[in-house]
Regions:
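Conserved acidic carboxylate
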Residues: 10
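Two-component/phosphorelay signaling modules centered on CheY-like receiver
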Residues: 13-31
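Conserved Asp/Asn-Gly motif in the active-site loop of CheY-like receiver
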Residues: 33-37
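Active-site beta3 strand of CheY-like receiver
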Residues: 46-52
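Active-site residues of response regulator receiver
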Residues: 54, 82
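Receiver (REC) domain active-site loop signature in two-component systems and cognate sites
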Residues: 57
Length: 128
């Protein structure tokens, strides 16, 4: 089996580096970008196994990426991360097709890793 490929779109350099290190140590191949436009460019080059998108980024936000890749037309899960615990944002993200939505201040890297692992297992089962 190939190494799972994760796309991380996060404009905060410190957080982006933390995610890259933790996921790399856990055996994932990582592509990291700083905004939604770069995320779309990377998705067009090579579809990720999972995309993790910050909600609020310059140039293009996570919602715009979700709108570009609705759940019915993509074969990879998308997780949205946000600094804000606004229920409306979470509802909009899920409505647009996010597979999960985490508030950064309420989440740990371990929780995010567990969610990614769960989504990868589900994806592999569907592909069999």
């Amino acid at each position: 089996m190939s190494i799972p490929n994760i796309l991380i779109a996060e404009d905060d350099a410190v957080l982006r580096e933390v995610y890259v290190k933790k996921f790399s140590i856990s055996g994932f191949s990582i592509r990291a970008v700083t905004n939604g436009q770069e995320a779309i460019e990377e998705i067009e080059k090579q579809k990720p196994d999972i995309a993790i998108l910050d909600l609020n980024m310059p140039v293009m936000d996570g919602f715009a990426v979700l709108e570009r890749y609705p759940r019915a037309s993509r074969n990879f899960p998308i997780i949205i991360l946000s600094n804000f615990g606004d229920t409306k944002n979470k509802e909009r993200g899920i409505t647009l097709g996010a597979d999960d939505f985490f508030i950064k201040s309420e989440m740990t890297i371990k929780t995010l890793l567990e969610k990614v692992t769960t989504l990868m297992k589900a994806k592999q089962m569907w592909q069999k």
